[in-house]
UniProtKB/Swiss-Prot annotation:
This is 6,7-dimethyl-8-ribityllumazine synthase. It catalyses: (2S)-2-hydroxy-3-oxobutyl phosphate + 5-amino-6-(D-ribitylamino)uracil = 6,7-dimethyl-8-(1-D-ribityl)lumazine + phosphate + 2 H2O + H(+). The lineage of its organism: Bacteria, Pseudomonadati, Chlorobiota, Chlorobiia, Chlorobiales. 5-amino-6-(D-ribitylamino)uracil binds at residues 24, 58-60, 82-84, 115. The gene is ribH. Pathway: Cofactor biosynthesis; riboflavin biosynthesis; riboflavin from 2-hydroxy-3-oxobutyl phosphate and 5-amino-6-(D-ribitylamino)uracil: step 1/2. The keyword Transferase applies. Keywords: Riboflavin biosynthesis, Transferase. Catalyzes the formation of 6,7-dimethyl-8-ribityllumazine by condensation of 5-amino-6-(D-ribitylamino)uracil with 3,4-dihydroxy-2-butanone 4-phosphate. This is the penultimate step in the biosynthesis of riboflavin.
Length: 155
């Protein structure tokens, strides 16, 4: 007996995307945005199918993502932001709350939400993950969003 395997494909044609982007550490965040847009366009989507919502920082991402998801205008949401560890416990709290909040929005709304929030020890790691040594996590998050929309459409 052959098990039927169902998975999403990397085809962004006819998918409406919302980018929800934290402005804090924007010089790195903008590289994530560029990576996400590049991925969508390389996989058959277009800039006309993308809307971008900017919020102050990572803590606000779940709130904006939920409002966007509930609008019903988008097939997928890509959250992008940058959290860099400082000398206080603020990093741990912020990273945990942003992560949990974004996951909760996805579960509550059943809209595919891709997590493209960098949580790094230092600025060098953030730069590496925004398009240099370690690829571009914005690009990776967009790939996840494309695949999830196409998977959802088969369920």
């Amino acid at each position: 007996m052959q098990v039927k395997q169902i998975e999403g494909v990397l085809n962004a044609k006819d998918i409406r995307f919302a980018l929800v982007v934290g402005r804090f550490n924007d010089f790195i965040g903008q590289k994530l945005v560029e990576g996400a847009i590049d991925c969508i366009c390389r996989h058959g989507g277009s800039e006309e199918c993308i809307a971008m919502y900017r919020c102050p920082g990572a803590f606000e991402l779940p709130m904006v993502a939920k409002k966007v998801a509930l609008s019903g205008k988008y097939d997928a949401i890509i959250t992008l932001g940058v959290i860099i560890r400082g000398s206080t416990p603020h990093f741990d709290v912020l990273a945990a709350e942003a992560t949990k909040g974004i996951a909760q929005v996805a579960l509550d709304t059943m809209v595919p939400i891709a997590f493209g929030v960098l949580t790094t020890e230092n600025i060098e790691q953030a730069i590496e993950r925004a398009g240099t040594k370690a690829g571009n996590k914005g690009f990776d998050a967009a790939m996840t969003a494309i695949e999830m929309v196409n998977l959802y459409r088969q369920i």
